[in-house]
From Swiss-Prot:
The gene is D7L1. One of its GO terms (cellular component) is extracellular space. It is found in: Secreted. This is Long form salivary protein D7L1. Disulfide bonds join 40-76, 72-131, 181-214, 255-266. One of its GO terms (molecular function) is odorant binding.
């Protein structure tokens, strides 16, 4: 057994033990971290002349300018990495240990420093739970433990690169979730079925069902809380179809079954099927580069058609 493989297996076993202590929570990998940060950028980065200023600070996890916009961005990230729980209005310090132990072979984070960081977070008490309240509560800890928290939460590029190299199961940068999932569902013998899937044919094959389940999870249509229709509605809005929300929710609520392929089939057999294809394609395109919208790109039907033709050509 190679040293790298042994390390990965040891980490996996340790994570399993820790997960049993902290419910069912798993440490977040680099792909998950990138998604969380990019989504918080999308939802909080302002338009206008100061957009670049905010982006230049936030990308380095420098919580400036000190205003409501930055406060809400910080709260978004803290909730996203599940260090802060908005429902209970409490910080989850135990998860720092789980995150650290899972990747410390790659991060090199000091155990004592991480323990101090965890202790500091455990002592935090939140009041109203507003953006400013959460921000001001966490800020002193952020300033004191900026560097170690960056390591623990895989925000250092060199650390993420090591993990990508060691773990082939993490989706790569520049790879769409459709491509990532297809590699795990189909092989050369079932390539024809994969091509049909690119054309939105409902073949009902086990491979297609596995691929759709994988994609739905990658697109966050299914998350740790189960099926997430809000995420699908969001994708319709991003192709400039907000008026379809009632229809989309109606289709999903009436869909028999609770599996990804069943929801996928319901949408493709509904009166919103063509718009769903566009929304699904646009999500695939954005999954290649999580900063797609942050960079100022918008839905462009002609460009999307061109990019999907390229993706189809790789399979068909």
């Amino acid at each position: 057994m190679s040293h790298t493989r042994a390390v990965v297996l040891a980490v996996a076993c340790l994570c399993l033990i820790l997960v049993q202590v902290e419910g069912t929570w798993n440490a977040l990998d680099p792909e998950q971290m990138r998604f969380i940060h990019s989504r918080c950028f999308e939802d909080n980065l302002p338009a206008g002349p100061k957009r670049a200023l905010y982006a230049s600070k936030w990308i380095k996890w420098e919580l400036e300018p000190n205003d409501e916009t930055t406060h809400c961005f910080a709260k978004c990230v803290l909730e996203g990495i599940q260090l802060y729980d908005s429902k209970s209005k409490k910080f989850r310090s135990k998860r720092i240990t789980i995150q650290h132990e899972a990747y410390k072979t790659f991060t090199g984070a000091n155990d004592d420093e991480v323990a101090k960081y965890k202790q500091a977070v455990a002592a935090l008490r939140v009041g109203s739970g507003s953006c400013s309240d959460v921000f001001n509560t966490y800020l002193p800890v952020h300033k004191q433990f900026h560097d170690v928290s960056q390591l623990v939460y895989l925000s250092v590029s060199a650390v993420a690169a090591k993990i990508y190299e060691a773990d082939p199961n993490v989706k790569r940068k520049g790879e769409s979730f459709a491509e990532y999932c297809a590699k795990r569902a189909w092989d050369e013998k079932t390539k024809g079925d994969a091509c049909k899937a690119r054309k939105y044919e409902l073949t009902g094959s086990n491979e297609l069902k596995a691929a759709i389940d994988c994609i739905f999870r990658g697109f966050r249509y299914i998350n740790e809380n189960g099926f997430n229709p809000d995420e699908i509605v969001r994708d319709f809005k991003l192709i400039n179809k907000p008026e379809l929300e009632p229809q989309v929710r109606s289709v999903l609520s009436k869909c028999a079954g609770e599996k990804a392929y069943e929801y996928y089939s319901c949408l493709l057999q509904s009166n919103v099927k063509e718009d769903f294809k566009h929304a699904f394609d646009f999500r695939e395109l954005r999954s290649v580069d999580y900063s797609y919208l942050v960079k100022g790109n918008v839905y462009d039907p002609a460009k999307l058609k061109e990019e999907m033709a390229k993706a189809d050509a790789k399979v068909c």
